[in-house]
Structures are given as C-alpha cells and as structure tokens.
C-alpha cells in the first residue's frame, strides 16, 4: 500500500505519470522472472535450464555489457576516488530496472493506441517527457556518504541516481523525448546502449 501513493501512484495524475512510477515498479518485478536468477526457473518454479543455448549466450553477452557500464560508475558525492558500483552484484536489479522501464513504456504506448491516440501535452510536457520525469521522481533521495559506501559494498540495488540516470541512458525513447544529443551529459552512444529484452 505504501507504493500506491505519490510519487509512485497518484489518482489525480495522468497515465503517463502513473506508468512512469508504479508501472515501472510493476514491470521491474515482472522483469525479475527473466533476470540472471529468475531465468533459471521454469513456469512451475522448478530450477531448470529452459532457455536455448543461443538465448542464454545472447543474454550473457548483454548482461556483461550492462555489468561493465555499472562497474564504471562512482556516486556523485563520492567522486572522484570513491568506490565504484559492483556491476556483478547489482546486475539482477539493474536488469529489473531496465526491463521494468521498458515494459511500462511499451504498456503505455499500447494503452494510448487502444484509446485512439496519445494525449495532448500537459504544462508544455509531452506524455513521453512526463513518463520519464515520473520515473526520475521515484528515485529522488539524499543519502549520507557512509550509507552510500555501505550500499555499494552490500546492497544488490544500485544507488538511486544510477537506477534512474544509467537506466534511461540505455533507452532510445528517452533520447527522443528530450532531444538528447552527444553534447549532453546523459548521452550514451547507441552502440553502447544495452537492451536485454
């Protein structure tokens, strides 16, 4: 019930805001069924390798790229010499975040198609922009340096700044929504963007 309130969900907000919030969280949980651990269980919950060898190899290749991205990240308040994110430790949650955002975005697109079209901008913001701004809002936090160091050493979740910014850097729709260019700090070359699913 705690998640069914702002910034995750707001009954007075439009669909783009709610899909970017609670939709991404629900998608994240669905994504765990197909992450590094969930993918080893079949539809009945039995531990079984049910993927083809080609599927597993493609998954491993993509996850290696995502691990490398996260291994390079140092939280803003600990820069320049602070500890890095452990991409291998956080990979399951990073896959969940990336998959969750992608699932929510696609679900919103389908919802608008079924409704006969996308809504007009609100306060000058397109539905795409409102979706991504809502996603960013769910990850806002202030954290003390020592708590950040502890999280980096023990928590399978990446620091929230990367649960937002590093994820959207891998989503093409984000670039389109905000006209992100190579001159912008969040730019990631298309050849380096990771899409697991």
Model-found features: residue ranges?
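Zinc-dependent metallohydrolase catalytic domains
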Residues: 1-23, 33-197
């Amino acid at each position: 019930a705690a998640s069914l309130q702002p910034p995750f969900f707001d009954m007075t907000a439009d669909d783009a805001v709610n899909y970017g919030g609670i939709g991404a969280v629900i998608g994240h949980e669905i994504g765990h069924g197909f992450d590094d651990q969930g993918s080893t269980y079949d539809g009945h919950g039995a531990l079984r390798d049910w993927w083809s060898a080609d599927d597993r190899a493609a998954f491993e290749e993509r996850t290696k790229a995502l691990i490398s991205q996260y291994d390079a990240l140092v939280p803003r308040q600990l820069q320049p010499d602070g500890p890095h994110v452990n991409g291998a430790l956080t990979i399951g949650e990073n896959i969940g975040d990336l998959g969750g955002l992608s699932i929510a975005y696609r679900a919103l697109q389908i919802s608008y198609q079924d409704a006969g079209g996308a809504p007009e901008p609100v306060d000058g913001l397109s539905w795409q922009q409102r979706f991504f701004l809502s996603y960013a809002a769910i990850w806002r936090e202030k954290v003390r340096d020592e708590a950040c160091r502890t999280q980096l050493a023990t928590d399978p979740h990446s620091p929230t700044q990367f649960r937002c910014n590093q994820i959207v850097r891998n989503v093409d729709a984000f670039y389109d929504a905000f006209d992100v260019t190579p001159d912008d700090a969040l730019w990631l070359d298309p050849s380096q963007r990771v899409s697991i699913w």
